């Protein structure tokens, strides 16, 4: 399993009327918790995986690179920016490097506080994971 970029649907009438746009993402699993997060420019957040839940990222501001490993252990990179939505399956390692300041919302499929072990830290080569 690997990280994938979700493609939104858009009701074009919301764009054509001049007021903006509404872009809709459909999660594969129900979301039970969401968190607003930010990463300062030239720093990382991550170097871990979640053994008990899937996670979705919706980037609301900024640009960065999300690093993961494929099933063969090789690093893969996803460039992300404002409006991108990623699905990160349970057990998939990930780390985000902020090219600019990043703001994003994370959506979890299980409440963090209901997990016996919500996070497992490791090193994906982007810097040391917090203890």
Model-derived features with residue positions:
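Short acidic-glycine-tyrosine-enriched beta hairpin
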Residues: 71-90
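Residue-level signal for short segments within beta-strands and strand-turn junctions
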Residues: 60, 68-70, 108
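Glycine- and acidic-residue-biased ligand/ion/polar-headgroup-sensing regions
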Residues: 52-65
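Short strand-connecting beta-turns/loops that link adjacent beta-strands
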Residues: 30, 52, 71-72, 101
């Amino acid at each position: 399993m690997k990280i994938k970029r979700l493609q939104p649907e858009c009701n074009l009438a919301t764009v054509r009327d001049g007021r903006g746009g509404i872009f809709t993402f459909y999660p594969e699993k129900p979301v039970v918790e969401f968190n607003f997060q930010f990463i300062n420019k030239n720093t990382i957040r991550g170097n871990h995986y979640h053994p008990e839940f899937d996670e979705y990222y919706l980037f609301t501001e900024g640009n960065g690179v999300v690093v993961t490993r494929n099933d063969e252990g090789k690093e893969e990179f996803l460039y992300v920016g404002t409006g991108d939505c990623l699905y990160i399956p349970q057990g998939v390692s990930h780390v985000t490097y902020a090219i600019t300041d990043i703001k994003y919302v994370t959506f979890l499929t299980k409440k963090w506080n209901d997990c016996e072990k919500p996070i497992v830290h490791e090193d994906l080569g982007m810097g040391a994971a917090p203890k």
